[in-house]
Amino acid sequence: MAKRPGPPGSREMGLLTFRDIAIEFSLAEWQCLDHAQQNLYRDVMLENYRNLFSLGMTVSKPDLIACLEQNKEPQNIKRNEMAAKHPVTCSHFNQDLQPEQSIKDSLQKVIPRTYGKCGHENLQLKKCCKRVDECEVHKGGYNDLNQCLSNTQNKIFQTHKCVKVFSKFSNSNRHNARYTGKKHLKCKKYGKSFCMFSHLNQHQIIHTKEKSYKCEECGKSFNHSSSGTTHKRILTGEKPYRCEECGKAFRWPSNLTRHKRIHTGEKPYACEECGQAFRRSSTLTNHKRIHTGERPYKCEECGKAFSVSSALIYHKRIHTGEKPYTCEECGKAFNCSSTLKTHKIIHTGEKPYTCEECGRTFNCSSTVKAHKRIHTGEKPYKCEECDKAFKWHSSLAKHKIIHTGEKPYKCK
């Protein structure tokens, strides 16, 4: 069972509770934190709780943890004057602690010292360090504390370079592991190693197929609360992220961010090869394959390869005969949504594509593209045999018959 230290100057140990390491905020303090800091707070509190649980503590789940697991705003935000109680553990003389060693073991290596200048009587050093100025590491930690032991800054666990202010029961070995990359925690089943208890616990949930979060609507279970929240939005149709410009709503903030670029015209992803810019990173990835010639998506049926996955999906329908897009007007079916969209224009008589040069309108984008070659004189289709060029692919096909001597048209 994890222990906690007694009053200053005492070596007596008592039982450690979650409240000892829980950090609570007043409403004003909580509103001062930005989104990233609030997320950091959630992560730290959940990790602390899991660490205590993994050490064999049999406690009922606190309301604060229940709220945080459901991504809710903490309901019991209040002022908790714990800033002066957070000790500093010297990482300079820290010994490597094995995962089997409990928080009790690490606390037994720590004794209370008093810093008269800053008035914080519960700051702690390793036994081997008698004074704060004994090593450069302590000096740095002490100076930082003297400058910024304000409630909010201390509560969000700010790190100055490599000198970190730990909460009362943190194991500094875990902090060091983040810098050194050492992974002391091992999964007994598969042997995979981790730096932190929370990462090990998360991994164990996956390979044991334990799904703690259940949808009340359909009974489906999930490994993580965030996955459950995501699933619920699909069922309810909830779209909480709304564009202020046009009112369109989205399920995820990332979708709203991408959508806003339509209004701003922002294209942050630029091709280093040709300079063309795109709104989405995935579009840039697909575009780069034009330059590299890479075609990673291959048809298992005929071996034909494609640069984008969607092109392979459409191609496979040639083999299967699947035509999932049906015209409601005439019942004709198509294997591609864009082909259906083009077809519908036949019924409406709409001609949405206009030539900027002469004003002529067309019902298909490919038709207006071909038409523009009349104005530009562009001839993109070239005969490999004689280098003669043509505006349209059909003209090139007819021309090739001259070289092959083929006579495809037969009198019946």
Curated annotation (Swiss-Prot):
Transmembrane segments: none
Chief localisation class: nucleus
Subcellular localization, as worded in the UniProt entry: Nucleus
Pfam families associated with the record: KRAB (PF01352), zf-C2H2 (PF00096)
Gene Ontology BP terms: regulation of DNA-templated transcription
Any one cellular-component term (Gene Ontology): nucleus
A single GO molecular function term of this UniProt record: RNA polymerase II cis-regulatory region sequence-specific DNA binding
Zinc finger regions, C2H2-type: 157-179, 185-207, 213-235, 241-263, 269-291, 297-319, 325-347, 353-375, 381-403
Domain KRAB: residue ranges: 16-87
Keywords attached to this entry: DNA-binding, Metal-binding, Nucleus, Repeat, Transcription, Transcription regulation, Zinc, Zinc-finger
InterPro entries: Ikaros_C2H2-ZF (IPR050589), KRAB (IPR001909), KRAB_dom_sf (IPR036051), Znf_C2H2_sf (IPR036236), Znf_C2H2_type (IPR013087)
Source taxon at top rank: Eukaryota
Family designation: Belongs to the krueppel C2H2-type zinc-finger protein family.
Functional note: May be involved in transcriptional regulation.
Protein known as: Zinc finger protein 735
